[in-house]
Amino acid sequence: MKFVDEASILVVAGDGGNGCVSFRREKYIPKGGPDGGDGGDGGDVWMEADENLNTLIDYRFEKSFRAERGQNGASRDCTGKRGKDVTIKVPVGTRVIDQGTGETMGDMTKHGQRLLVAKGGWHGLGNTRFKSSVNRTPRQKTNGTPGDKRDLLLELMLLADVGMLGMPNAGKSTFIRAVSAAKPKVADYPFTTLVPSLGVVRMDSEKSFVVADIPGLIEGAAEGAGLGIRFLKHLERCRVLLHLIDIDPIDGSDPVENARIIIGELEKYSQDLAAKPRWLVFNKIDLMDKTEAEEKAKAIAEALGWEGKYYLISAASQLGVKDLCWDVMTFIIENPIAQAEEAKQPEKVEFMWDDYHRQQLAEVEEDADDDWDDDWDEDDEEGVEFIYKR
């Protein structure tokens, strides 16, 4: 199945049903009073995370989702039926962005998580709501309000513990094939990897972590060169980044300059991503003897001003790979995701008609107070003023 990590859709919630103007008329009850019911609320549009999905390709073809309108009110105080909700299923890891305002509505990070993205319109009020002591036959009603309408951008971001980045042909896909059951394509030409892939690294029966492989970066990726930097978003949720460096590039390029290009593109994309823990991993050490590889790796690290630990591996022959994986596993265990970060969600999204219903009822009560006349003044806005005399 084709991997699609972005899609734009239109969601429209259902309109609220209109209120009804009706009066009770039965035998022997000629003046039964108002009995018009309220309309029904419009249906909502929800997002739901589903772990069985892994792409947004369905929403490249189906782009519009509309919830059902609420039914109108009826006589005999019958309230209209509420409109049916619409649920849109997306892969776990999807971020929902309102393209109109630019706000992030939510991150779908857990299976079964639900997010309200468009709220249905409020129901209209029937004339029963407007009766008062001085207005026994109200002919007022209100119509239902329109439902929310939003243009949404869906961004699928892979959920992985470890992210891999580097130049094309640095050996990222070979590494993920060596440590997991994932089988990304491997070849001797640049940009063999065209889409991100995930692999589960099982250290033993109880310990494992997920690693993400993304297409390689080249100079100018931030301006769209190569495959650009749009795949870097898949590393935003990773806890540690493995920066793979080809210690002896076949094209004769300078490994130090290659590493600086990656760091520069990372900083152009996001300062937060550039600040994540990043480990240097020198790959393809099987192409030279051990002493030469160690000397070359040390020289590259010094040229980069690298003061931390670095690793020498050969993904093809799996030399040094197991030790690296155990160190990664230890780091993940010692640095669990903070509860505050895990529970972090965007601020509450405001919907169009959040306060409408409360305002409507307040206006009805206010009108009723205005209609009350205690006969202490000379003015009556409606009805007959009775003057009693002895």
Curated annotation (Swiss-Prot):
- Where is the protein situated, by its record's location annotation? Cytoplasm
What EC number(s) has UniProt assigned to this enzyme?
Answer: 3.6.5.-
Q: What does this protein do?
A: An essential GTPase which binds GTP, GDP and possibly (p)ppGpp with moderate affinity, with high nucleotide exchange rates and a fairly low GTP hydrolysis rate. Plays a role in control of the cell cycle, stress response, ribosome biogenesis and in those bacteria that undergo differentiation, in morphogenesis control. Binds GDP with a dissociation constant of 1.7 uM and GTP with a dissociation constant of 6.5 uM.
> Which InterPro entries does this entry report, sorted A to Z?
G_OBG (IPR031167), GTP-bd (IPR006073), GTP-bd_Obg/CgtA (IPR014100), GTP1-OBG_CS (IPR006074), GTP1_OBG_dom (IPR006169), GTP1_OBG_dom_sf (IPR036726), OBG_GTPase (IPR045086), P-loop_NTPase (IPR027417)
Q: What molecular functions are annotated in GO for this chain?
A: GTP binding; GTPase activity; magnesium ion binding
- What GO terms describe the biological role, i.e. biological process, of this protein? ribosome biogenesis
Recorded source organism is Salmonella typhimurium (strain LT2 / SGSC1412 / ATCC 700720)
- What cofactor does this protein call for? Mg(2+)
Q: Does the keyword ATP-binding apply?
A: no
Subunit-structure text:
Monomer. Binds RluD (AC P65836) as well as the 30S ribosomal subunit protein S9.
Provide the family line: Belongs to the TRAFAC class OBG-HflX-like GTPase superfamily. OBG GTPase family.
**Under which name does UniProt file this protein?**
GTPase Obg
GO CC term, one of those recorded: cytoplasm
Using the record's annotation, list all stretches that form the OBG-type G domain. 160-333
List ligand-binding residues for GTP.
Answer: 166-173, 191-195, 213-216, 283-286, 314-316
Compositionally skewed regions (Polar residues) per UniProt: 129-145
Which residue ranges are recorded for the region named Disordered? 127-147
Positions of the Obg domain: 1-159
| Enzyme class per UniProt | hydrolase
